Regions:
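ATP-binding N-terminal substructure of ATP-dependent carboxylate-amine bond-forming enzymes
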Residues: 1-82, 87, 95, 119, ...
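Active-site nucleotide/adenylate-binding loops and adjacent lid/helix of ATP-dependent enzymes
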Residues: 2-9, 15, 71-76, 85-182, ...
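Short secondary-structure junctions
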Residues: 32, 105-106, 129, 237-242
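Glycine-rich phosphate/pyrophosphate-binding beta-alpha loops
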Residues: 58, 143, 203-204, 261-271
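Protein kinase-like catalytic core scaffold
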Residues: 133, 188, 195-196, 244, ...
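Phosphate-binding site of ATP-dependent enzymes
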Residues: 144-234, 238, 249
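ATP-dependent carboxylate activation and anion-phosphoryl transfer catalytic cores
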Residues: 224-288
Length: 288
């Protein structure tokens, strides 16, 4: 009997995002049957699968309570999940950046304002001397409720901060000019090994690089020193993830981490030859 795995997705992409569909034939070549399954579909019999791989679950941040319950249910049934639930829970709250900084990872400076403390956002930015800064919910994805603001704040900006702070804890970071000048680098790793790199660029008049906001993605060849710095981020974790996307900027010769994506990142397989096969081999190795 062949191995059967679920590639978890969400309701708006029941057949997976286009990039993730590349995994199905790559896994089939290794004798592994893979099919999309909507994570929130209560009719799905997850115990019928040998493992679940989180892929296009791009609504988890706005349904986080349900998502946590789904993770717990898979755990209770001892269904192998990658990335594993403890790592997913840790990565879901962007305060993980503070944890990684404490482990010696070079990150973009990050401050936290607690839920409902909108006034703390302005105080933090002012105290750090940031005349332009970015806010986002600690639990968010795809540029959700992410804004670039300037000091001194006007009434509209304060209203925006109040709305974001009402959702939960808020990340406050200095605006990275490097995003506008060059873009954001993304390094994809499968089972701890570097696969490929891409660069995401924002459209004119926008700072968010996600394609949902008009951003573009291109493949890029990066120097070994940058790959090594991105790899050090992955090595800083307590467990080696099946997949990881390390996002950040370069400042001089240094790579600064902006996000470590371990839940449902687009790993841009279509931008690198044989990337889908590398991912498939990593999955096969985990399955044993």
């Amino acid at each position: 009997m062949s191995t059967r795995i679920a590639l978890a997705t969400y309701e708006r992409a029941p057949g997976l995002a286009p990039d993730d569909r590349m995994l199905i034939p790559a896994l089939e070549r290794l004798g592994i049957r893979a099919q999309p399954a909507i994570w929130s579909d209560r009719s799905t019999r997850w115990r019928d699968f040998d493992a679940v791989i989180i892929r296009s679950c791009w609504d988890y941040h706005i349904r986080f309570g349900e998502f946590e319950a789904w993770l717990a249910a898979l755990d209770a049934d001892a269904i192998p999940l990658w990335n594993p639930a403890p790592l997913v829970r840790w990565n879901a709250d962007k305060r993980y950046l503070l944890d990684l900084a404490g482990r010696g990872v070079a990150t973009v400076p990050t401050m936290i304002a607690m839920r409902g403390h909108a006034d703390a956002v302005e105080s933090l930015a002012t105290a750090e001397g940031w005349d332009r800064f970015v806010i986002k919910p600690a639990i968010s994805a795809s540029g959700y409720e992410t804004f670039a603001l300037r000091t001194p704040l006007d009434d509209a900006s304060r209203a925006t901060i109040a709305r974001v702070a009402s959702l939960g804890a808020v990340l406050v970071q200095p605006f990275a000019d490097e995003i506008a000048r060059f873009g954001e680098l993304s390094f994809t790793f499968f089972d701890g090994a570097f696969s490929h790199a891409t660069v995401k660029r924002a459209r004119v008049g926008e700072f968010r690089v996600q394609t949902e906001h008009g951003g573009t993605v291109d493949s890029i060849v990066v120097e070994r020193a940058l790959i090594d710095q991105a790899a050090a981020v992955v090595r800083a974790l307590d467990v080696r993830p099946l997949y990881a996307r390390v996002d950040g900027i370069t400042r001089g010769d240094a790579f600064l981490l902006m996000e470590l994506e371990l839940i449902e990142p687009n790993v841009f397989m279509s931008y690198a030859e044989d990337a889908a096969d590398r991912f498939a081999r990593a999955i096969a190795q985990r399955l044993g």
